[in-house]
Amino acid sequence: MIKLDHLMYAVPDLELGMQQIHELTGIKPVMGGSHPGVGTRNALLSFSADQYLEIIAPDPEQDLAGTTGELLARNPNSGLRAWAVASDDLAAIRDMATQQSVTAREIVDMARTTPDGMALAWKLLF
């Protein structure tokens, strides 16, 4: 099973990005949380129960050196940067990408805590 999970809207400043999306859509995004060790934090705008727009930005509370947050901080432009699919078999997705000459990194474990204290965990493949 493969389906669209979310779109990533990258911004150099999360509050500014939330304001931009609110002005574009008329819908106010909600705070998501921080991605420890990745240098990012996010806000979310739901499309449905399991599809959303992620507004992702550098996390000023983290050391950004060598992280995705550092890359976002260096780019002053906001915009749609990536999309993500959900799958119950990321290894198969990685293999399909490799067969199509698309470079894929290793699958990594990710986690964050929501503002209301719920722990979330998932696997990620770039």
Task: Go through the PLM ranges and name each one.
Residues 1-44:
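An N-terminus-focused feature that recognizes amino-terminal "leader" regions
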Residues 3-13, 41-48, 53, 67-126:
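Vicinal oxygen chelate
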Residues 19, 55, 65, 93-95:
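Short acidic, gly/pro-rich beta-turn/loop elements at beta-sheet edges
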Residues 27-71, 118-126:
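Conserved short beta-strand elements that form part of the metal-binding/catalytic scaffold
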